[in-house]
From Swiss-Prot:
Domain of life assignment: Bacteria
Renumbered residue ranges of the record's region Disordered: 353-389
Family: Belongs to the DNA mismatch repair MutL/HexB family.
Gene: mutL
Polar residues composition-biased segments: 353-368
Protein name listed in UniProt: DNA mismatch repair protein MutL
Protein's job: This protein is involved in the repair of mismatches in DNA. It is required for dam-dependent methyl-directed DNA mismatch repair. May act as a 'molecular matchmaker', a protein that promotes the formation of a stable complex between two or more DNA-binding proteins in an ATP-dependent manner without itself being part of a final effector complex.
DNA repair found in the keyword field: yes
Species per Swiss-Prot/TrEMBL record: Brucella melitensis biotype 2 (strain ATCC 23457)
PROSITE patterns the UniProt entry points to: DNA_MISMATCH_REPAIR_1
GO MF annotation list: ATP binding; ATP hydrolysis activity; ATP-dependent DNA damage sensor activity; mismatched DNA binding
Keywords: DNA damage, DNA repair
SMART domains: DNA_mis_repair, MutL_C
HAMAP family: DNA_mis_repair
Length: 623
């Protein structure tokens, strides 16, 4: 076959396959162009799920008449000069408009702020017509009709109009969060009108904009994040552990204002919550990373949704550390939606109802609290689990066992069979966050009273968290005891993996794992953590090598040790059906108030719920 040049139209259609995946991709590119033009008002109109019509109107700086033809030409842009590593605009490749024009009927109208009139150009299937004068307010209008008419095969991969319209809404919301000073509006024949008024600049304005997208509840259950390390700044808001969702759709990440879907960022977010929410639940978070453009490559993919950090370990450590610190400092704080879920359940069932109405599908459904929690799992593969996860040998970790027993002793279980009754308590206890214990019901739940609320505590879940935190503190207070192998185990690895793992030998030794390089492509393992018992050393070392290669950390071993501690805490805590004295119940409440993360157990279930007096009065029709 003869090698030849492709036509400009074919080139643009090939580029469109990477840039323009669906109607939402078009909106993303056009809205980003409007933001780069300095717009403060952006209006989006769609029809037919975006396949029939897409229109974006802005009040930005506009495009001069003599540059309109260039604007729809490939690789023509005003946002990039000669340094591809210093990218400060959302768009920079100069591919979006020509790619869109090659597969649709595109009309570009613009009037600069200092121009007396507007001009327009039309691109139909890649063929340019214009420019010619047109009546227009200052700003730019981009109208796209019959998307993919020139490549009808692409239409077969489109979803329903409703699904495509929803995807467009999600794109606008995701971009809008990062630019609260811009007013966004969505309208069209295929949707309910939606508007995000401008809220200004600063953290409060950003939180208000987030509330427009995620709802008022998020603001009531959010923790502010603001941390910096080695020139990388992390800001934003994360939900408290008990405010979580069943999927990851409520997680937003931005790098220098650009919305991204980076697996490293979301993996770090997941890691920060690993101890406080269930594995099948997802935290709600909005994170903004700001750093020198030279430290991040945004030119990884034409869609610009993926990025590559120069130091991914730094970014991961910053995210995990900042979020864990915020969670630890948040204190006792239940999700506001917990009480509302209870109220809805009561209203649905009615007093004395024989049949239960469906409960709200969220993490605070009373039915879900009664469900047995899933067993905690480590981050290791199923093959590792066959040897690493065996019945616990508590003799292997006497220091941890003693620490756990000390915590158990703080809330000793009475031998008496006397039932706990309503307890008198000093008034000052009612001023505490969890109040004063008043009774124990069903030998599992502690009922406490504060000055303005009623608190119900799951005694086993609460004590499980207390024991777990004590065991973790013991793990970090001193090096983990190791057990020497009679014969060192040699693990063959690629040379670069062996070198990286050997570089973390000192860190691994603190967790009871003794390793050293054994030739250019092997690691000798001389000692393993005693509390893990027998284990698949080969698999452990390979998993650690993979983790270090990807994240430059060896947190997987720590996660395994924490898993063992969590299992010990679960089996060593006050069990359901055990009767407690009033002073023991109050001691448990005070320990919860002093323990970070005590709002959830090790499996992510809530340890307590709080009903405000106003909520109770609403139940009885007093409000």
């Amino acid at each position: 076959m003869t090698i030849r040049h492709l036509s400009e139209t074919i080139i643009n259609q090939i580029a469109a396959g990477e840039v323009i995946e669906r109607p939402a991709s078009v909106i993303k590119e056009l809205v980003e162009n409007a933001i780069d033009a300095g717009a403060t008002r952006i209006e989006v109109v769609t029809a037919g799920g975006g396949k029939t019509l897409l229109r974006v109107t802005d009040n930005g700086s506009g495009i001069p008449a003599d540059e309109l033809a260039l604007a729809v030409s490939r690789h023509c842009t005003s946002k990039l000069t000669d340094d591809v590593h210093d990218i400060r605009a959302l768009g920079f490749r100069g591919e979006a408009l020509p790619s869109i024009g090659s597969v649709s009927k595109l009309t570009l109208k613009s009037r600069p702020q200092d121009a007396d009139s507007g001009f327009e150009v039309c691109v139909t299937g890649g063929h340019l017509d214009g420019p010619r004068p047109t009546a227009l307010n200052r700003g730019t209008i981009v109208e796209v009709r019959d998307l993919f008419y020139a490549t009808p095969a692409r239409l077969k991969f489109m979803k329903t109009d409703r699904a495509e319209a929803t995807a467009i809404t999600d794109v606008v919301k995701r971009i809008g969060i990062a630019f609260p000073h811009i007013r966004f509006s969505l309208a069209g024949t295929d949707r309910t009108p939606f508007e995000m008024p401008a809220t200004g600049t600063g953290a409060e304005a950003t939180l208000e904009r987030i509330g427009q997208v995620l709802g008022r509840e998020f603001g009531e259950n959010a923790l502010a994040i603001d941390a910096e390390r080695d020139g990388v700044r992390l800001a934003g808001f994360v939900g408290i552990p008990s405010f979580n969702r069943g999927n990851a759709l409520h997680q937003f990440a931005y790098v220098n204002g650009r919305p991204v879907r980076d697996k490293q960022i979301f993996g770090a977010l997941r890691g920060a919550y690993s101890d406080v929410i269930a594995r099948d639940r997802h935290p709600v978070a909005v994170l903004f990373l700001t750093l020198d453009p030279a430290l991040v490559d945004v030119n990884v993919h034409p869609a610009k949704a993926d990025v590559r950090f120069r130091d991914p370990g730094l970014v991961r450590g910053l995210i995990v550390g900042a979020i864990k610190q915020a969670l630890a400092q948040s204190g006792i704080r239940p999700a506001t939606s917990g009480a509302e879920a209870m109220l809805q359940a009561f209203r649905a069932e009615g007093f004395g109802a024989q049949q239960s109405a469906p409960r709200p599908a969220n993490s605070y459904s009373p039915a879900s609290w009664r469900t047995a929690p899933p067993a905690p799992r480590s981050e290791w593969s199923p093959q590792t689990a066959q040897t690493a996860h065996r019945p616990l040998d508590l003799q292997a970790a006497p220091a941890l066992r003693e620490n756990g027993q000390a915590v158990l002793g703080d809330v000793a279980v009475p031998a008496s069979d006397a039932r706990a009754s309503v307890a008198e308590a000093p008034v000052e206890l009612m001023q505490k966050p969890l109040g004063a214990a008043r009774a124990q019901i069903h030998e599992n739940y502690i009922v406490a009273q504060t000055e303005d609320s009623l608190v119900i505590v799951d005694q086993h879940a609460a004590h499980e968290r207390l024991v777990y935190e004590a065991l973790k503190n013991a793990l970090h207070a001193r090096p983990i005891a190791g057990q020497m192998l009679l014969i060192p185990e040699i693990v063959d690895l690629p040379e670069e993996d062996a070198q990286r793992l050997a570089g973390h030998a000192e860190t691994l030794a603190r967790f009871g794992l003794g390793v050293e390089q054994f030739g250019p492509g092997a690691i000798a393992v001389r000692e393993t953590p005693a509390m893990l018992g027998e284990m698949n050393v080969q698999q452990l070392i390979r998993d650690l090598a993979d983790e270090i290669a990807e994240h430059d950390t060896a947190d997987g071993l720590k996660a395994m040790l924490h898993h063992v501690a969590a299992t010990m805490a679960c089996h060593g805590s006050v069990r359901s059906g055990r009767r407690l004295k009033p002073e023991e119940m109050n001691a448990l409440l005070r320990d919860m108030e002093a323990t970070p993360g005590s709002g959830t157990c090790n499996h992510g279930r809530p340890t307590y719920i709080e009903l405000k007096l106003t909520d109770i009065e609403r139940l009885f029709g007093r409000r």
